[in-house]
Amino acid sequence: MTAKSKTSTSEGAPGAVWFRPEKQSRTKPLLTQDKIVSAAVELLDRDGVRQLSMRKLADRLQAHATSLYWHVSTKDDVLDLALDAVFGEVRLPVESGPSWRDDIIAFMAELRRVLLDHPWAAALASTRPLAGPNALARSEFVYAALAAAGFGRADVLAAGAAVSNYVIGSVSAESVWRHQDEAGTRSALAEHLRAREADYPALAGNFPADGGDWQAHFDRGAQYLVAGMAATAGLE
């Protein structure tokens, strides 16, 4: 991108990095945006979003903090770029599967796998526009699969959002549970519900004190979602 894009996005806002012109250098820099992003993902995987700072990132790269600002303007730039790098890990099929349902469910499973590998990514994805090239390519895959299946424009938009929101939301919840004392918290909550069974009979009777099977719960929910999408769009 060589000319500045016309956009109402604030220069320092999440997502602004995608609409800002790239800086051109006459010499080959020792520090590159790819190196910055790779280091950022490593730090985010280790410490999470709150602990990431430009200074820590510079230390990781053995560089001066000011040298980062040639490539990125803010921490939000770094987060946007790192998140899009994670979306780039989501593998897309070379060929379509037996049906659009298979393609969508396979995509959801693959997106879940990648987001669980980077526990910070799902929660971050819900806070900013996913406008990077990798995220857009994955959205294009979903939209194209739905359109080819016969979904109308309004249904493509709604179903596409449902797919991403289901995966991002479920992974966000799973990541929170897994990065605390899940067994202890579930046991305490189960006891709390049993003591108040008159107030919460359905919860007390169905809450999985042992945590259940996250993968099985996700897969079952994905089947419900896709079946509902098909029924709503009249494609059963």
From Swiss-Prot:
Key word Repressor present: yes
All copies of domain HTH tetR-type, residue ranges: 30-90
Domain of life: Bacteria
GO terms, biological process: negative regulation of DNA-templated transcription; response to antibiotic
Gene3D superfamilies per the UniProt record, alphabetical: Homeodomain-like (1.10.10.60), Tetracycline Repressor, domain 2 (1.10.357.10)
GO molecular function annotations of the record: DNA-binding transcription factor activity; transcription cis-regulatory region binding
Keywords: DNA-binding, Repressor, Transcription, Transcription regulation
Record-linked InterPro entries: DNA-bd_HTH_TetR-type_CS, Homeodomain-like_sf, HTH-type_TetR-like_transc_reg, HTH_TetR, Repressor_TetR_C, Tet_transcr_reg_TetR, Tet_transcr_reg_TetR-rel_C_sf
DNA-binding feature ranges: 53-72
Protein role: Transcriptional regulator that inhibits erythromycin production. Directly represses the expression of SACE_5813, eryAI (encoding polyketide synthase I) and ermE (encoding rRNA methyltransferase), suggesting its direct regulation of the erythromycin biosynthesis gene cluster. May play an important role in regulating secondary metabolism in actinomycetes.
Identification of the protein by name: HTH-type transcriptional regulator SACE_5812
